[in-house]
């Protein structure tokens, strides 16, 4: 009888866990749909800002201020600023592992070339995975849950802008998971500085950059860096929710399979007990 009690307790526990995983699956699905809409709405903006920056790359150095040139020219220093986006929470499969593995491989490759590294880490999981081995490289760490997304973007942007203006970094690379579908997230690294010309865009006249005065290009650079961080952050968040939704769906299905097996085991145990009791009753009756 104690075995039956243990089985019933375990079935109850698994059913309780299944309710939690199902709820998490539904929440992630809802968040994913909402963020996908935001990404779709921002695609046109990203395309426009990329084209404008590509046009600016065609301008000569004398047309740019000294401060502006710093964002387009490769600096003599070999210091790389790596911005790593991960999640605050787990329960999302291989989501964090894939991007952290890529970052570690790139750090090893860059250091072997004699280049220096600075890290800006967004997300608790990334910080926990990198702090032990690369504590000396970490410049900043942001807990996403404690900072509103827009404030986070502004803080990271200011870190980047100051580092470039002070000639502290030569390259800025952002690491994030790019969303393909709920089951597939692509670990992605994107070089955002120095700004380079895109071959996909044709060159247009530079006259219209002068209409708003000498600060127009500086403002565009600010918008460009902001847009790149925002895009990567949205992609990373929707990828996280997709990965968590898939992981929780698998967990829910596994819980359902486990419940079926436990119920079958419970029924067989009950049947064995009943059969044993019947045999004992029949044997007792025959003895009388």
UniProtKB/Swiss-Prot annotation:
**What membrane topology does the UniProt entry give?**
Peripheral membrane protein
Claim: Cell membrane is one of the keywords in the record = yes
Which Pfam families does the protein's record reference?
A: ATP-synt (PF00231)
Specify where it is mainly localized.
Answer: membrane
Top-level taxonomic group: Bacteria
Q: Which CDD domains match?
A: F1-ATPase_gamma
GO terms of molecular function: ATP binding; proton-transporting ATP synthase activity, rotational mechanism
**GO biological process terms on file:** proton motive force-driven plasma membrane ATP synthesis
Q: Cellular component GO terms, alphabetically?
A: plasma membrane; proton-transporting ATP synthase complex
**PROSITE patterns per record:** ATPASE_GAMMA (PS00153)
Subcellular localization is given as: Cell inner membrane
Q: Which UniProt keywords apply?
A: ATP synthesis, Cell inner membrane, Cell membrane, CF(1), Hydrogen ion transport, Ion transport, Membrane, Transport
Q: How does it assemble?
A: F-type ATPases have 2 components, CF(1) - the catalytic core - and CF(0) - the membrane proton channel. CF(1) has five subunits: alpha(3), beta(3), gamma(1), delta(1), epsilon(1). CF(0) has three main subunits: a, b and c.
The family annotation for this protein states: Belongs to the ATPase gamma chain family.
General function of this protein: Produces ATP from ADP in the presence of a proton gradient across the membrane. The gamma chain is believed to be important in regulating ATPase activity and the flow of protons through the CF(0) complex.
Q: Which PANTHER family match?
A: ATP SYNTHASE GAMMA CHAIN, ATP SYNTHASE SUBUNIT GAMMA, MITOCHONDRIAL
Q: Which protein, by its recorded name, is this? A: ATP synthase gamma chain
Gene transcribed to yield this protein = atpG
